Amino acid sequence: MSKQFESVQATLEKYIPAEELSEVKRILYGYNRGHHVKSLPICQEALDLANKNNFEIVASKVEADPEQLRKPRIVRLGIIQNSIGAETTAPIQDQYLAIEAKIEKMIDAAGAMGVNVLCLQETWHMPFAFCTREKYPWVEFAESASTGQSIKFIQRMARKYNMVIISPMLERDDVHASTIHNTAVVVGNNGNIIGKSRKNHIPRTGDFNESTYYMESTLGHPVFETIYGKIAINICYGRHHNLNWLAYGLNGAEIVFNPSATVGELSEPMWGVEARNAAMTNNYFVGSINRVGTEHFPNEFTSGNGKPAHKDFGHFYGSSYFSSPDNCCTPSLSRVSDGLNISEVDLNLCQQVKDKWNFQMTARYELYAKFLTDYINPNYQPNIIKDPSMK
């Protein structure tokens, strides 16, 4: 593809004078404790890995106010966005190994930076081939969530760096008739499997033909308690559903990752808004991850919109970033490059923002519980009061 637009942030910094830029960034990206989000120094080992292996690193720091009784709960979070590593016509195993080789170097950089919790993008170990509606060869990427090769690789890296790693994958559930699921496996810092979450909302729009392969999760909204904090995974399309975000928060999540695969024409104006809103209204940190690059497939497919058949999904625009409970957000990765985004956060900020805004105290859950109970009744009638003067 020809030269792509790198990022909104890079363009602002290139063309807006420094004084005005400071105010623009305050309004667009928010303040943390009265100032712009601070940068975090990147160690030389991580920089060398990035330069040698052609990926970018950004790092930031989100602080909480000091407290008298609670010590700071400092955790380093990492998110990785990546393109595929081989042509989609290559043998399946070659495609997987090419991606694994990329990811290993980026996890090495995360380890050098002392990342505690790392999340990869949606189905990181394969092309996002669900646009094709073809079952084979793409379902051959599906594997066991406990013994698959991608999980064994992630377990090895988790042990190596004492790191909790979330591995979003295409799961083959051998226990239940070999059904396929869009799953995120949570691997503990000892390399143990803590549990798994699945995609709650499956898109049926444009080229997102995912229900051809898997259906909605029945696991609910699990939150995983780790030595570094309470973690949840809201996979991709679930970010468009406010109640999905809410449920993870009510279950106690402090960090919610949103591993995604989404393209510019469909969702890019929404990308910088949804996760920040969720972080603020639910009082937790959010790591938003999107794959990057344009993936071309061997056979043409259509989008159901009357336009010509094509062989690519469109451009996955990356732009992975973190959102904070206080509604600031960190610098994002670019729209065009593989990358690692790191943010050092103080989890005490979650409670501090709850105490400030009182969203949970003022939420009126009973009001909405009754409304939703009424709404799902087949005989529900909307409460619409009509102007009597209307004819």
Curated annotation (Swiss-Prot):
GO terms for biological process: beta-alanine biosynthetic process via 3-ureidopropionate. The active site is at E122 (proton acceptor), K199 (proton donor), C236 (nucleophile). InterPro entries: Aliph_Amidase/BUP (IPR050345), C-N_Hydrolase (IPR003010), C-N_Hydrolase_sf (IPR036526). Gene3D superfamilies: Carbon-nitrogen hydrolase (3.60.110.10). It catalyses: 3-(carbamoylamino)propanoate + H2O + 2 H(+) = beta-alanine + NH4(+) + CO2; 3-(carbamoylamino)-2-methylpropanoate + H2O + 2 H(+) = (R)-3-amino-2-methylpropanoate + NH4(+) + CO2. GO terms for cellular component: phagocytic vesicle. The modification N-acetylserine is found at S2. Residues 75-347 form the CN hydrolase domain. It holds the Pfam family CN_hydrolase. Keywords: Acetylation, Hydrolase. Pathway: Amino-acid biosynthesis; beta-alanine biosynthesis. One of its GO terms (molecular function) is beta-ureidopropionase activity. The keyword Glycoprotein does not apply. Catalyzes a late step in pyrimidine degradation. Converts N-carbamoyl-beta-alanine (3-ureidopropanoate) into beta-alanine, ammonia and carbon dioxide. Likewise, converts N-carbamoyl-beta-aminoisobutyrate (3-ureidoisobutyrate) into beta-aminoisobutyrate, ammonia and carbon dioxide. Belongs to the carbon-nitrogen hydrolase superfamily. BUP family. Homodimer and higher homooligomers. This is Beta-ureidopropionase. It comes from Dictyostelium discoideum.
